[in-house]
């Protein structure tokens, strides 16, 4: 949630003089909803929030699209990192809908909702994916209109042409470190792994 990003937001603001927007994802913090959308539906909210930020900060001095000075970094941690990567693939005809987004920073994001849930079933409960994960996936599709396989940061980063910084510590037990490597490999240049 947004509170978790306060320290990073502070650094962006104080050290780099960036304006910051720290929204809560659906079902977290002060956001509405009771169920996490695991980044998939949240990616569309983030795109709307970037529009709002552009209206607040970029149109202050002019209404001309060409002369706006808004430049944005989309940065997320864990599920927020997966959301960041899911946002990164939202392109139409090779163009980003939000030309003011300049780069992405993902810190410990997962490859896909399916992979994350499958890993947690095994790590926490020593259970296989079938039948529980398959059933939960079907229920999610019925209730929320998306499924765990569709919600793939891995597929989204393949479409990303903007710079992305990948951060993943080897002590992370919730999102396994191995997930950063296929994500990094799938992302076209420019990219960096830290």
Label the predicted regions.
Residues 1-11, 178:
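The serine-hydrolase catalytic nucleophile loop
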Residues 9-32:
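Conserved alpha/beta-hydrolase
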Residues 36-63:
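Alpha/beta-hydrolase active-site loop
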Residues 59-78:
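Alpha/beta-hydrolase fold nucleophile elbow
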Residues 86-149, 155:
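Hydrolase active-site cap/lid region
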Residues 153, 162, 176-185:
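Short alpha-helix in the alpha/beta-hydrolase fold that links the catalytic acid
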Residues 159-161, 166-168, 172:
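Short beta-strand/loop motif that positions the catalytic acidic residue
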Residues 184-194:
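Catalytic histidine neighborhood in serine/cysteine hydrolases
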